[in-house]
Regions:
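Aromatic-lined substrate-binding rim segments of carbohydrate-active enzymes
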Residues: 1-33, 41, 104-110, 114
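Aromatic- and acidic-residue-enriched carbohydrate-binding clefts of CAZyme catalytic domains
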Residues: 2, 30-55, 84
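Low-complexity, compositionally biased segments
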Residues: 8, 36, 91-93
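Generic structural signal for short, flexible, solvent-exposed coil/loop and linker residues
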Residues: 9, 29-30, 45, 49, ...
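Aromatic-enriched hydrophobic runs in primary sequence
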Residues: 12-27, 38, 61, 69, ...
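General "foldedness" signal
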Residues: 27, 32-36, 81, 96-99
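Active-site neighborhood of glycoside hydrolase catalytic domains
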Residues: 55-116
Length: 116
């Protein structure tokens, strides 16, 4: 989903009383270039992707802060139509860093997202 088209799509789903399961990443899917991650992450010394790397998690937290601030009205607990938010995607076939998954889930919680 691209934005602002994504916001229009969420509003349309809400208007028609359709529920949404959101997949905001950080890794979205193999069908998108680099899984939806920005390629400039590769140029950051010391940054490792999709693991419990503090530099990566810092970038993830900044992304989620911006995203979830805008999504908050659409969350189910706020009367919206987002009923679930996926933590990562296809991670079991890539890695098994449970600390990373817990850290991403905590970033969700820190931003008021509990639908996962």
């Amino acid at each position: 989903m691209t934005f602002p088209a994504g916001w229009m799509w969420l509003a349309l789903c809400r208007r028609h009383r359709l529920y949404v399961i959101l997949r905001p990443g950080p890794y979205i899917c193999a069908e998108m270039d680099f899984g939806g991650l920005p390629s400039w992450l590769l140029n950051r010394p010391g940054l490792a992707l999709r693991c419990n790397n503090p530099l990566f998690l810092q970038k993830v937290a900044a992304y989620y802060k911006q995203l979830f601030d805008r999504l908050r009205p659409y969350l189910g607990e706020n009367g919206g139509n987002i009923i679930a938010v996926q933590v990562e995607n296809e991670y079991g076939s890539y890695g098994n860093d449970k600390d990373y998954l817990r850290a991403v889930a905590q970033i969700y919680r820190d931003n008021g997202v509990n639908e996962f």
